[in-house]
Amino acid sequence: MRSSSGLNGMRENNSFPDNTRNPQILEVTPLNSMPYIGPVTHASMSSNRMNDSVEKVGGPAMIFLPSDSSSEFSNLISQTKTGVALTGSAAMGKIGLTIGLVDIAESEDSYYFRVALPGVSRDEKEFSCEIEPDGKIMIKGATTTGEQTVCKHNQIFKMLTQNLCPPGHFTINFQLPGPVSNEEFNGNFGSDGVLEGVVKKVYYED
C-alpha cells in the first residue's frame, strides 16, 4: 500500500506548471565548443601516412611492390601517368641494370650460368660468347633497344619514355669459380633474352 501511495504522490508532484507548456526559446552562445574527434584506428593512421608520403610524380617512375596490396597499388600507380608498377616475383629481383645480370650454379662436374640479355641481337655476326680455360667468360653483342621511333605492324611509334639500354655494342665479363674445359660447352641464347650455358669442370692432378 505504501509503495502504491508513494507512486501516486510522485506522479502528482511531477505535474508541470502552466507556464512551461509554451516555453520561450532563447538563443544562447556556448561558452566553449570543440569538434568531436573519434578514437584513432589503425586504418585511419595508415591512410594518413599514405596521403602524407605519396607525392605526385611528373616523370617516369618505377614502383616495386613485393607483396600483394591492392589499396597501396591503386593509390601509388594513380599518382603517375608514365610509371611502371612491378608486383610479385618481378619486384623481387635486383633494381638497376637490365642487361648483364648473371646467375651461376654448379654440379659435381659442370658449371651452369645464365645471363640476362633483353633487347640484344641474336645475330651470330654481332653476338659471341668466349670461354677461357681459367673460367673467364666474355660476352660481346649489340643492343637493339633505345631507338627514338619503332616501326611495328605497318605503324610508326614515337617513344614517350625510354628506360631500356640505348642501341650500341657492349661487352660483359665474369668469372666462373674454377677452371673449365672450354671445348665442352653447350649454350643457348633463347628468344626470352636469356643466355644459358653449361661447361665442364677441369680438375688438375697435384
From Swiss-Prot:
Keywords: Stress response. InterPro entries: A-crystallin/Hsp20_dom, HSP20-like_chaperone, IDM2/3-like. PROSITE patterns: SHSP (PS01031). Residues 1-23 are annotated as: Disordered. Induction: Not regulated by heat. SUPFAM superfamilies: HSP20-like chaperones. Residues 92-206 form the sHSP domain. GO terms for cellular component: nucleolus. Disulfide bonds: none annotated. Does not interact with IDM1. Belongs to the small heat shock protein (HSP20) family. This is Alpha-crystallin domain-containing protein 22.3.
